[in-house]
A protein has these predicted regions:
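Amphipathic alpha-helical repeat scaffolds of TPR domains
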Residues: 14-20, 30-41, 68
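Canonical positions in the second alpha-helix
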Residues: 59, 92-93
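Structural signature of tandem alpha-helical TPR/SEL1-like repeats
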Residues: 14-17, 47-53, 80-92, 114-121
Length: 121
């Protein structure tokens, strides 16, 4: 099991490095939204939020209607303390996927941080 985890981590690291190389060299590329989600999660897990935000912008340029990518964008914006922008991203995600409870939870958390307690409920 530990070996399988290590292998997955190495594959993810390789994917992130490939992505960074393509961005650095301004190479046109396309990834499935799930690959972008994995790349962005790696940046979030490693506290590289600005790089994660860059990755999410590229991902959303290719997958405009992915509520999961918009939620990840909101998570990064929250980590960067850009709460108003996070709410905009969450609002877009909600319009695409109105039943996703993660959107409600994150929206409530951001509204509490902003002191909008009545709106957080």
């Amino acid at each position: 099991m530990a070996e399988e985890f290590k292998k997955r981590q190495e594959e993810l690291q390789k994917l992130v490095l490939e992505f960074e190389l393509q961005v650095k060299n301004n190479i046109d590329f396309y990834y499935d939204s799930e690959y972008y989600e994995r790349i962005v999660k790696w940046y979030i897990d490693n506290h590289k939020f600005k790089l994660g935000l860059r990755a999410i912008e590229i991902a959303l340029s290719q997958h405009k209607f992915s509520s999961d990518l918009l939620i990840q964008k909101a998570n990064i914006l929250i980590a960067l303390q850009k709460f108003s922008k996070a709410l905009i991203s969450l609002d877009k995600a909600h319009s695409l996927n109105p039943k996703d409870e993660n959107i409600f939870i994150l929206t409530g958390q951001v509204k509490i941080i902003l002191g909008h307690y009545d709106d957080a409920i």
